[in-house]
Amino acid sequence: MKTSMQRKLDQLSTRLAELNDLLSRENVTADLDQYRKLTREHAELGPVVEQYALWRQSRSDETAAQELLADPSMRDFAEEEIRSARERMARLEVELQKMLLPKDPNDDRNIFVEIRAGTGGDESALFAGDLLRMYLRFAERQRWQVEMMSESPSDLGGYKEVIVRIAGQGAYSRLKFESGGHRVQRVPATETQGRIHTSACTVAVMPEADEIGEVEINLADLRIDTFRASGAGGQHINKTDSAVRVTHLPTGIVVECQDDRSQHKNKDRALKVLAARIKDKQYHEQHAKEAATRKSLIGSGDRSERIRTYNFPQGRMTDHRINLTLYRLEAIMDGDLDELIGALVSEHQAELLASLGDAD
C-alpha cells in the first residue's frame, strides 16, 4: 500500500476515534444540526476504518508468519499463511481504494428524471412510457418516493415528455448513468407486416437543488406565462388558467407544469425543475473540459450519446458504453436494474482509479 494512502487511512482512524468520543458525551444532542453532521460523518468513516483494521490485521498475520520461516518444521505452514495474508491484503487494498475515491457531491441528492420521445413518433412516445414505468418500478423496489412534476401525454398512449421527481437515499448515485439516448427495436402494435421498427428517447437525470436559493435565479430573468391546462384523449380540461410556463431568458430553458389544479403549486414545481435544469447545465459545462480530457465513457451524461439499445424480439438489452449485453429484458423493463447499475458503477470506479493512477 502506498504511504500516502496509509497516512490518509491513519488520519481517518484517528478522526473516527474523535467522533466516538464526541458522540458519547451527554450533551451531544443539544445542537441537533451538529449531531446530525457528526452521525453522518461517523456512518461514512466507520466502514472505511473497519476495512483498514482488517488490512492491518492481515499485515500483522504476514509478519508473524515471516518469523516462523526459520523453523523448518513450520516452513510449509508459514508460507501458506504468508500467501493467504498477502491475498487478503491485496483484496482489501482494492476495496479501500474504491472507498477513498472522491465522492460526487450530488450522489445523495433527490433527482428529477426527464424522458423525451425522440425519433419514431407514436412508438417513441409509447417507449417513453415504458421507460418511465421501468424507473418507477425501480424506485418502488428502493422504497423511494415519486412525484409527477410535468407530463405531456401522447394521443396513442405514452408521453411526448414527462418529468418525475424521485426522492430517496442515494437516488442520484444510482440513476445518474441513465442520462443519454435510449434506442428501442421492436414490432409496434400498429405494425401489420411484423416489421421491426427502431425509435429512440432521451433521458436526463438531474440532481435536485437543495433549495431554489442554491441556484441563483434573478426574477427579472424569468418570463412566467399562465394558460389553460390541456389533456389528451378527452381528459379533464381546466376552466381556469392554472397551467404555468416559466422561461429562463438567459439560457432559454422552458419548463411547463399543468398537472395540479392549483396555479401556485404548478409554479412552485416549475421553479424546482428550472433550478435543477440550470444546476445540471452549469455542472455539465463545468465538467465538459475535464470529461474531454479524460474521455470518460460512463460519466459524461451526454444527452446526444446513444447509451443503450433495448431489442424486444431478442429479449436483450445492450449498454454500449461498457459493452454489456443482458438477455433478461422483461425483468429489466420491470425495474430490475441492480445488475446493470452495479456494472456501470464498477466501470466508473475503475475509470476513476485509472485517472488517479495517471495523476500519480
UniProtKB/Swiss-Prot annotation:
Modified residues (N5-methylglutamine): Q235
Gene Ontology terms, MF aspect: translation release factor activity, codon specific
GO cellular component terms given for this protein: cytoplasm
Compartment annotation: Cytoplasm
Pfam families: PCRF, RF-1
Function as written in the Swiss-Prot or TrEMBL entry: Peptide chain release factor 1 directs the termination of translation in response to the peptide chain termination codons UAG and UAA.
Protein name, entry field: Peptide chain release factor 1
Species of provenance: Burkholderia multivorans (strain ATCC 17616 / 249)
Biological classification of the source: Bacteria, Pseudomonadati, Pseudomonadota, Betaproteobacteria, Burkholderiales
GN (gene name): prfA
